[in-house]
Amino acid sequence: EEEKRIDWETLYHHLKTDFQDKGGELVRQMLSRSARYGGGNTISDQWAVKISESYSNQVRSVSQKYPGYQFIPGWFSWSNTIVLGKQVGATPNGRHAFEPINHGANPHPGFRKDGALTAMSNSICAVQPGYGNTAPVQLELDPGMGRGEEAVQKIADYIMTLFEQGATLLNINIVNGQQILEADKDPSKYPNLVVRVTGFTAYFCSLTPEFRKLVVDRILIQG
């Protein structure tokens, strides 16, 4: 709104119509390319920190009302990304109504075309809720990234730095993009392919087609 590109009323209207009205797709594309959470030190990242702190404080305050119970804040969707997404309308990051929400504290897939692994990681580290719970980092790596001692050391350094900055949980997939595409077309050809879905692993062939697509999209976009 400060840039005079769109006002709150117009944005609200496009969200309520799932960008299906006149000019809706143009607005959706603009939103999907805006400075979003996970892109580094953007205004959206700053708001994410404020929202996380407010949410954590509100959750903890509930414990004071119910002695004997401890309510712990956390930022994770676990295996409910599809189920929860079906209850959520269009969102200002360009996501269509009822599509899956993001995995845990990760930005929605496709938030930046350059991958921006460090920027994404910094953003997630900044919204850790504390109190013993987590805002997990979901990381997709191509096996080729680990070829050679130097490459392995870079990955190890990244992981060490991640936790030094405050990360509390890291889920890693090391899967070849072409292989995951082939497995999605015919899961029976890859009965032993195991993927890290979020806070748990599963045989890829055991996932529903809808959940397989979610994992494939995430791996191809970020991997």
Feature-to-residue mapping (PLM):
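Acidic, glycine-enriched catalytic cores built around paired aspartates
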Residues: 1-223
